[in-house]
């Protein structure tokens, strides 16, 4: 039997990140903001005396079984399926192998080695509730993205999330002892689309490494990147996929240049391939050429954090035109560096950006609207400077230290309400009730 924790703070947490490693380079493949979130929050929890072991699927034969990411933070690479060539959509076929690897590691230790499970993304949640039941400890889950929400705002030509994912998410929501949402809007989405109990949801905002992402010398940053100091640089940072909508920025830039051919606008695209449709960097290059702005667009591969900070500092404006974002770490990182953000008015971007104070939110994705919004900023240097001055002050509200504190409070709530030795308490979800909801919704047949 697992002994309850007297101070309600776990000694050691098993963090599950099945589909992407926290050590992977953000901006390519399936690596993005979630990778940064998992690693940075783990580092901060370790600094607070909580050991963290992150389980992820091995994607190379060269992956060591265990890697130390930071003091108190281990990454365990679980062999589950082929190392390469397995699409994220096919990962459910390897969850049994992944679960076996996780349970096998725990079995090497005395009972109670892990005090809590924290799963990230629905695939990890499927593993998480099995580990929770096996070990008799609470499960906390962070969705990061939700199929029901993504499918409501698909980019043209993008592939809808499959029904199997939404059913899987419904199960995880029903099974979790606590749910962590990035914003109150995401909390509302969990209730509205998945029937989550609002009393089990904790809103914990992601953060940024404010020691790394801070204002600096713009000319020096441009010299480092080989950018002309006389140009107006608008930057996109992220995976090149329809969801992130880099094409929206390119089309708006082309429209703006058509309106003002003497414009000094330069578009900087920083990221690697992912997803479907406009996922290949060369497809975006072809789009720039077809729009007649190839000479005005610079492409860079994903950048290491210190170099990425220079990218933000070198930019006059950072664009986040996504069709869906649960938060938008790029927006916070850019503002922390003193760079205003122009973003789509979707999801958590309404929290990450203070429209009119640290940047501008744009409704919809029409080329004309984005071009006009861009023009309103780049044509008014004084306005842009005022936004830039306020941006770092806003970003100070979002740090990984704050995120870790919020997560630890969620862990405390999960722990005090967990009925050790007897499974979930009356305040926690039960598997039967969750599946009953699914059957009533027609998602699962009895």
Curated annotation (Swiss-Prot):
Gene3D superfamilies from the UniProt entry: Glycogen Phosphorylase B
Protein residues bound to Mg(2+): 312-313, 315, 339
Example GO BP: mycothiol biosynthetic process
Catalytic activity: 1D-myo-inositol 3-phosphate + UDP-N-acetyl-alpha-D-glucosamine = 1D-myo-inositol 2-acetamido-2-deoxy-alpha-D-glucopyranoside 3-phosphate + UDP + H(+)
UniProt-recorded Gene Ontology molecular function terms: acetylglucosaminyltransferase activity; D-inositol-3-phosphate glycosyltransferase activity; magnesium ion binding
Pfam family, one: Glyco_trans_4_4
EC number: 2.4.1.250
Protein origin, superkingdom: Bacteria
Entry binding sites for 1D-myo-inositol 3-phosphate: 19, 30-35, 88, 121, 145, 165
Keywords, comma-separated and alphabetical: Glycosyltransferase, Magnesium, Metal-binding, Transferase
Residues reported in the UniProt entry to bind UDP-N-acetyl-alpha-D-glucosamine: 25-26, 33, 239, 244, 303, 325, 333
Record's keyword annotation contains Metal-binding: yes
Function: Catalyzes the transfer of a N-acetyl-glucosamine moiety to 1D-myo-inositol 3-phosphate to produce 1D-myo-inositol 2-acetamido-2-deoxy-glucopyranoside 3-phosphate in the mycothiol biosynthesis pathway.
NCBIfam families from the UniProt entry: mycothiol_MshA
Recorded family membership: Belongs to the glycosyltransferase group 1 family. MshA subfamily.
Quaternary structure, from the entry: Homodimer.
Protein's name according to its UniProt entry: D-inositol 3-phosphate glycosyltransferase
Organism (species): Rhodococcus opacus (strain B4)
């Amino acid at each position: 039997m697992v002994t309850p924790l007297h101070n309600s703070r776990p000694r050691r947490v098993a963090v599950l990140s099945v589909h992407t490693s926290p050590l992977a380079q953000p901006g390519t493949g399936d690596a993005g903001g979630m990778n940064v979130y998992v690693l940075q929050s783990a580092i901060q929890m370790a600094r607070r005396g909580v050991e963290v072991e992150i389980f992820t699927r091995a994607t190379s034969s060269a992956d060591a079984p265990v890697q130390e990411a930071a003091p108190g933070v281990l990454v365990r690479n679980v062999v589950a399926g082929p190392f390469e060539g397995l699409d994220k959509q096919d990962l459910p076929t390897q969850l049994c192998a992944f679960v076996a690897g996780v349970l096998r590691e725990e079995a090497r230790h005395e009972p109670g080695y892990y005090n809590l499970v924290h799963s990230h993304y629905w695939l990890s949640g499927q593993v998480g509730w099995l580990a929770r039941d096996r070990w008799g400890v609470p499960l906390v889950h962070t969705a990061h993205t939700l199929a029901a929400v993504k499918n409501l705002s698909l980019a043209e030509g993008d592939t809808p999330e499959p029904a199997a994912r939404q059913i899987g998410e419904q199960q995880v929501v029903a099974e979790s002892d606590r749910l962590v949402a990035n914003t109150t809007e995401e909390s509302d989405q969990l209730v509205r689309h998945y029937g989550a109990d609002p009393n089990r949801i904790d809103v914990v905002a992601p953060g940024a490494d404010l020691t790394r992402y801070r204002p600096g010398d713009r000319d020096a940053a441009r010299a480092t990147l080989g950018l002309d100091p006389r140009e107006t640089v608008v930057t996109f940072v992220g995976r090149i996929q329809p969801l992130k909508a880099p094409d929206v920025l390119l089309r708006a830039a082309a429209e703006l240049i058509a309106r003002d051919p003497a414009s000094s606008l330069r578009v900087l695209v920083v990221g690697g391939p992912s997803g479907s449709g406009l996922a290949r960097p060369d497809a975006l290059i072809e789009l720039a050429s077809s729009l007649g702005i190839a000479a005005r667009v610079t492409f860079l591969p994903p950048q290491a954090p210190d170099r990425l900070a220079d990218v933000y500092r070198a930019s006059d404006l950072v664009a986040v035109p996504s069709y869906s974002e649960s938060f938008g770490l790029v927006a916070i990182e850019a503002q922390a560096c003193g760079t205003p953000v122009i973003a789509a008015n979707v999801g958590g971007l309404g929290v990450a950006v203070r429209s009119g104070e640290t940047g501008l939110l744009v409704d919809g994705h029409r080329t004309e609207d984005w071009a006009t919004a861009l023009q309103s900023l780049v044509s008014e240097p004084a306005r842009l400077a005022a936004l830039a001055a306020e941006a770092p002050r806003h970003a100070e509200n979002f740090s990984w230290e704050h995120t870790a504190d919020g997560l630890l409070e969620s862990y405390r709530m999960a722990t005090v309400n967990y009925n050790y030795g007897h499974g979930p308490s009356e305040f926690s979800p039960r598997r039967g009730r969750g599946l009953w909801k699914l059957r009533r919704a027609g998602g699962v047949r009895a």
